Amino acid sequence: MADGPRQMTDEQLLRERFGFSEFRPGQREVLDALSVHGAALGVFPTGAGKSLFYQLPALRLDGVTLVVSPLVALMKDQIDSLHRRQIEAARLDSSLASAEVEDINRRLVAGTLKLLYVAP
């Protein structure tokens, strides 16, 4: 990949980083609204690709994107999926050992994480 994520179009990111050939219905409109207005409301059923609304923009932004999720199992699944796509992500929740938390803190300070999932 010659261009970094900040220089790629959303369609290129979708293909090259997420492995999809096209957006699902409604995704393009929500991403456009986020880009133009900084906020959007999208109501979609389970499995409709809502995670893309914060995962794709996270690749364009400097720093880390914080994702609050009450479901640890869902966080684990999403992080595993991101890792398969070579996207740096981690989670903070009460199940982690102190050494794991310290490692995540080091990665945050180093600026290597793009997404950090936290449980309330």
Task: Label the predicted regions.
Residues 9-25:
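Dynamic helix-loop-helix/coil hinge segments at AAA+ ATPase domain boundaries and subdomain interfaces
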